[in-house]
Design a protein with these regions (language model features):
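Acidic, polar ligand-binding/catalytic clefts
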Residues: 71, 75, 80-144
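Ligand-binding cleft/hinge of the Venus flytrap
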Residues: 70-77, 158-181, 211-212
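Alpha-to-beta junction loops
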Residues: 43, 79-80, 97-105, 148-149, ...
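A ligand-binding cleft/hinge motif common to bilobed small-molecule-binding domains
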Residues: 89-93, 106-115, 161-168, 190-224
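Periplasmic-binding protein-like
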Residues: 48, 124-131, 204, 208-246, ...
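Short, well-ordered beta-strand segments
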Residues: 43-45, 130, 151, 200, ...
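N-terminal hydrophobic or amphipathic helices and topogenic motifs
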Residues: 3-4, 11, 15, 21-80, ...
Length: 277
């Protein structure tokens, strides 16, 4: 019996080693443990309040294009994908503190951010303005936002552009907007539904999704077009992920994923822009 048990253990060990070897051979790129927050894991931060690109379904499961993209990156690196759900305002400090490897929440690319982090722009995106159904404020142009109460997520590109727009209005002699910031976009749209704000600002994909559902009306779109990126602290890891994304472009899986969500990827190769070290 002992000999039989030992044989079973030996066979299991051989099979396990063979499986691990096969998996290693499937990995085109290897990531040293020193480049990761957690061994064998690609840890990513996400704020899942932007359907259809990143959201939580009725079962509590993370869904969306960006979630799938992160999972595919991890798969091609033979790493386990792990998401940390957190508000956007905490993401950059958390990245710098080493709490996660990558911000995968659709962070807009700016030159200022590229001075702080390794950024890989991969997606074309822009800003939308949504109102209650029927567009009660009759908003058809930016000037119609004068004097309106607008909801926006705190601390991001969207808030910055909202404040720039407010200045543009007042510089023209129009009334400024009453800007209300929220921890995330979901709370902003909940406030719009409750009539606490008159308009809500979001990305184009989310504004279109809410209109498709019949929840709100998207009255302005395509504002401030800017690429969206993933962001990392570790440059060697960022360089490796850029190679993975460009491999996906080459084999067609990148475009297939984007097309399924009606999103346009950037033109050209995906490159790393950030500090030298």
């Amino acid at each position: 019996m002992m000999k039989f048990s030992f044989a079973l253990v030996s066979i299991a060990a051989i099979l396990g080693a063979t499986q691990a070897q096969a998996q290693a051979q499937d990995c085109k790129y290897s990531v040293p443990e020193s480049q990761l927050v957690k061994k064998g894991t690609l840890t990513m931060s996400v704020n899942p309040t932007l359907p259809p690109l990143q959201y939580v379904d009725q079962t509590g499961t993370l869904k969306g294009m960006r979630v799938e993209l992160g999972e595919e990156i991890a798969k091609r690196l033979c790493l386990k994908p792990e998401y940390v759900r957190i508000e956007f305002s905490a993401m950059v400090p958390g990245l710098q503190a080493g709490r996660w490897d990558m911000i995968n929440t659709g962070i807009f690319y700016t030159d200022e951010r590229a001075k702080l982090m390794q950024m890989l722009a991969y997606e074309d995106q822009a800003i939308s303005i949504s109102t209650a159904k029927g567009n009660p404020g009759k908003i058809s142009k930016l000037e119609d936002l004068a004097g309106k109460t607008i909801g926006v997520e705190l601390g991001g590109f969207e808030e910055r552009k909202t404040r720039e727009l407010d200045k543009q209005l007042t510089d023209k002699g129009l009334k400024g907007m009453n800007i209300r910031t929220f921890e995330n976009f979901a709370m902003s749209f909940q406030s719009l539904r409750a009539g606490q704000v008159e308009v809500a600002l979001s990305i184009d994909s989310t504004g279109a999704e809410y209109q498709k559902r019949g929840d709100f009306e998207r009255v302005l779109s395509g504002l401030f077009p800017t690429p969206v990126a993933v962001a990392l602290k570790n440059k060697p890891l960022a360089d490796t992920i850029a190679k993975v994304l460009n491999d996906m472009r080459a084999d067609g899986s990148f475009q297939k994923l984007f097309t399924s969500y009606g999103v346009k990827p950037i033109d050209g190769a995906i490159v790393v822009k950030g500090p030298a070290t």
